[in-house]
Amino acid sequence: LPSVNSLADKRLAAALDMALLNQAIAGETFHAAMLDGALGFTPDLITVAYGTNDWSCKPRDMLVRDAEECLDGVRRLWPQVPLVVIGPLWRGDQDQFPERFPFADLQPLLASAAERHDARFVRGDELFPAVPELMQDAFLHPNDLGQALYGERLAAALKR
């Protein structure tokens, strides 16, 4: 989710009646070394929502490798916990970097990785509209209204 204690976090936690631990902050990318099996509890649900930051700094093959390693690590630590991989939200600058692989390719890449790891996939681009006014910076980070919308839509998707 966008940030710790964001409106999206709060909406999601309330809708699912769960405590929420968010490790997707500060430009984080798929990074298996950050997984910590010594949390002191077993999660009821794990969501993985990386990809947009990876796209901005990694070639396709590195992104796929890192996603696979991260999901391998999640499955090794918590093999029985339901796992949901969430594709990236719309970003307003996705067409401004022709040297990168197409941003739209992320959804199917991550869907395939999710399938290989017995995880459900939720398309992030279907949870958040391409509306710059819902972003605090007009292209990447949802504002309060955008976070509220994302939290509600993600909660509904996870309940299905």
Segments from the language model and where they lie:
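Alpha-helical cap/lid subdomain in secreted, periplasmic
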Residues: 33-160
